[in-house]
Design a protein with these regions (language model features):
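Short secondary-structure boundary micro-motifs
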Residues: 1, 22-25, 100-101
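Conserved, charged catalytic cores of large soluble enzymes
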Residues: 1-7
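Proteins synthesized as precursors that undergo proteolytic processing into mature forms
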Residues: 10-36, 43, 134-204
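Hydrophobic alpha-helical segments
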Residues: 30-167, 238, 243, 266-287
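Acidic, low-complexity N-terminal propeptides/linkers enriched in Ser/Thr/Asp/Gly that mediate export
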Residues: 43-47, 53-61, 66-72, 117, ...
Length: 315
């Protein structure tokens, strides 16, 4: 929140002498400026994840309603959606003089049954997966944390780990797993170039071309069908969603494989197509309304996924 005095130095003072998970959690109570993701591991084999920070509870969200604009837009300051005042004495380790989501309800996990966990600035509880961060409930409080996260990165890491451990079928463009994760596997994951957003959006372009060749397709769509478009469609359909970077260890890319060439061309087609689609939808509408603002790539991709998942895509 950043509006009140905090005691982060107390956190690190406690951690400097911590010998177990309980003491680590004790120190975490004083890290209140902003919100961070923390990983924990000790010599006894314990692992844990914690989100830190204080999350004030909004009056309207706590009541299960939304009063006016959502909290990620400018809100009406005349009442009805303020931070809830404290219902009792302010805890000694709390910086914000308002009711906050209890620490036990802040995203965290200790010694998960899977023996691993993933975090990459993603939504730690999944409330934004349906493009609505306000429609869940958490023990009577509005569980709102943020309107958006870097979701594809953590999704790909999770997919890679599950694939390497043979928990899921090997995804396209991913080496088969052997049931264990080595240091070499971790290095490969770190250098992964798979484009998860392409996996979500490219099929819409493929489907649009397929529908263009069917009877009854809109004239504006069927008139665009030509050998070049069909070739682009086939390249997208053959894409493993990898975007080859052209560099390899120790710096010599060598001769690209046939699949890498296919993926490189498909990556180019996809990125140009998505950029043009954003330009002709969101950008065009904003310009028509006289709005100079243009959404960033993250917001644009999120918007496309939201719209295309709800409205039939005709191209």
């Amino acid at each position: 929140t950043g509006n009140y005095a905090t005691r982060e130095l107390e956190t690190f003072y406690i951690w400097n002498t911590a010998t177990d998970l309980a003491t680590f959690k004790q120190g975490l109570q004083f890290f209140d400026f902003g919100s961070q993701n923390w990983g924990y591991a000790d010599v006894l084999g314990n692992i844990a994840y914690f989100a830190s920070g204080e999350f004030p509870i909004r009056e309207d969200l706590d009541a299960g309603t939304l009063h006016g604009n959502p909290p990620y837009l400018v809100r009406d300051g005349t009442g009805g959606n303020e931070w809830k005042p404290l219902g009792g004495p302010q805890p000694a380790d709390q910086a914000v003089p308002y009711e906050v989501v209890p620490f036990a309800q802040v995203p965290q996990i200790e010694n998960p049954a899977a023996h691993w966990w993933v975090n990459a600035n993603n939504d730690p509880i999944g409330n934004t997966a349906d493009n609505d961060p306000l429609d869940e409930a958490l023990a009577g409080t509005g569980p709102y944390l943020s309107p958006g996260y870097d979701e594809f990165r953590a999704a790909r890491i999770t997919e890679l780990i599950k694939s390497e451990l043979n928990l899921i079928p090997t995804p396209p463009g991913t080496p088969p797993g052997d049931g264990v994760i080595s240091m070499a596997d971790m290095e490969r994951m770190q250098a992964d170039v798979n484009q998860m957003e392409g996996k979500r959006l490219a099929p819409y372009f493929v489907g649009a071309v397929d529908r263009a060749g069917l009877g009854g397709a809109p004239a504006a769509l069927s008139s665009l069908l030509n050998p070049t478009i069909i070739d682009a469609r086939n390249r997208l359909a053959s894409w493993t969603y990898n975007a080859p970077a052209g560099f390899d260890t120790p710096g010599d890319p060598g001769t690209p494989t046939a699949q890498e060439l296919v993926d490189s061309v498909a990556t180019t087609i996809y990125n140009v197509a998505v950029g043009r689609l954003m330009n002709r939808t969101f950008d065009a509408r904003l310009a028509a309304e006289g709005i100079g603002y243009r959404q960033g790539t993250t917001e644009g991709v999120r918007g496309l996924i939201r719209v295309l998942s709800r409205v039939p895509f005709t191209g």
